[in-house]
Design a protein with these regions (language model features):
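A short helix-to-beta-strand connector/capping loop
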Residues: 3-4, 22-25, 113-117
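Local beta-strand N-terminus motif with an aromatic residue
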Residues: 4-5, 83
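N-terminal glycine-rich anion-binding loop in soluble enzyme alpha/beta folds
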Residues: 6-72
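General beta-strand structural signal in soluble alpha/beta enzymes
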Residues: 7-9, 66, 88, 119-122
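Short amphipathic alpha-helical segments at helix-loop
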Residues: 57-61, 87-90, 118
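N-terminal glycine-rich phosphate/adenylate-binding segment common to multiple enzyme folds
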Residues: 72-102
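Active-site histidine-anchored catalytic micro-motif
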Residues: 91, 96-138
């Protein structure tokens, strides 16, 4: 059955990027910073990313994460709205404030795209639970 809307999520979904592509689910990537350098949570697209991350940990370097900001959500959502209505299942508000930025961006875009539907859902779960929720919605 073909969906009548675009389903999107964040890279914290704990599913392989190839799986997300096969299900036609756009992903918004979180980032982390080590020693002032920003890295993308690329969901395994770069084969060196995970070994690099673990080398940081082994060296005692603690990666710092941050929320996805409103501007990043605006850009991501707008690109999806050009194609159709959007349901974004966000990473849990219990571990990140990003969902609040997603809601703020959605409100701004609803004014710009009054004929489009943009719904942001707080998954209230993380890791594999988040992945299962997105998979079920797909």
């Amino acid at each position: 059955m073909e969906r009548k809307f675009i389903l999107s999520c964040c890279s914290t979904v704990d599913l392989p990027y190839s799986y997300m592509q096969s299900r036609d689910i756009p992903v918004l990537f979180y980032t982390y910073v080590v020693d002032g350098q920003e890295y993308v949570d690329d969901m395994g697209r770069d084969p060196e990313a995970l070994p690099r991350f673990y080398r940081f940990l082994e060296a005692g370097k603690l990666p710092q994460t941050s929320q996805i900001n409103v501007g990043t959500y605006l850009d991501f959502f707008e690109a999806q709205l050009e194609k159709g209505d959007l349901l974004h299942i966000a990473f849990t508000s219990g571990q990140s404030g990003s969902v609040h930025n997603a809601v703020a961006a959605a409100k701004l875009l609803q004014e710009k795209y009054p004929d489009k539907k943009l719904v942001v859902i707080d998954s209230l779960c993380s890791s594999s639970g988040y992945g299962l929720l997105v998979d079920y919605a797909a």
